[in-house]
Design a protein with these regions (language model features):
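Bacterial N-terminal signal peptides
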Residues: 10-21
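Short hydrophobic alpha-helices and adjacent helix-cap/hinge residues
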Residues: 3-5, 24-226
């Protein structure tokens, strides 16, 4: 069984536990399970996650309707618009249409969700995101001048956000230790990322720890102000 299948089945177990417990109190008009995806559902990873979830959910006896919303996030310069896209999606699912559960796939959708001033009191499961994140910039900010602040998702759990799922956790210090162990003559280490939300979030994580790593600071390349 692939790691993805283990992940899907674990998430499904949580979903069914939550949904069935809600049915004890819900009416016949229980709301849907809402999946919010950063990307077009036709992309390979997104398709695999959603398809396997749907198969396992039905196989496990799930009967609640599942609704998929796509934010269609593309390049980083669009980041100031993502907050509004997420707000528009959440506004569609209120009152009698309130979801029993929200599943968020992708870092852009996740960043858009935690950037909301108001978050519905609904359990959230997430996938395809990392433990380190950055809040989205204001709509009037030039993204090229953006200096994002690192945040740890654990902070939101500590504040009472009903959150579960799998997170990617990057141990920069351990990676540096491994590099120096395998290549002891190494004098300089550079982090090179693409100019995406994930790349910028990784840069922010590394900058947060710069000066704490044994040896020289890392050179960071990838985000250029224009």
């Amino acid at each position: 069984m692939t790691l993805l299948k283990y992940y899907i089945r674990f998430v499904l177990f949580i979903v069914l536990s939550l949904v069935f417990s809600f049915h004890l109190y819900a009416t016949d008009n229980a709301g849907p399970i809402l999946i919010i995806s950063s990307y077009n559902p036709d992309t390979r990873n997104t398709t695999a996650n959603i398809s396997e979830f749907m198969e396992e959910y039905k196989r496990g006896g799930g009967i609640s309707p599942v609704v998929i919303e796509n934010m269609n996030c593309k390049s980083l310069p669009e980041a100031p618009l993502w907050d509004g896209k997420m707000r528009g999606i959440l506004d569609k699912y209120k009152e009698n249409n309130t979801p029993q559960l929200i599943i968020i796939l992708g870092q852009e959708a996740w960043a858009s969700y935690i950037s909301q001033e108001y978050k519905p009191n609904i359990p959230v499961l997430c996938g395809m995101i990392s433990k380190n994140a950055i809040l989205l910039p204001d709509s009037d900010l030039n993204v090229a001048e953006w200096e994002p602040k690192y945040i740890d998702i654990q902070e939101y759990v500590d504040k009472g956000l009903h959150l579960g799922g799998f997170l990617y956790s990057y141990d920069v210090k351990e990676n540096i230790r491994l590099i120096r162990k395998l290549y002891p003559q190494t004098q300089n280490i550079a982090l090179i990322t693409d100019n995406t939300y994930g790349g910028l979030a990784m840069q922010t994580l590394v900058k947060k720890g710069n000066g704490k790593y044994q040896g020289s600071e890392l050179d960071i390349t990838g985000w250029k102000k224009e």
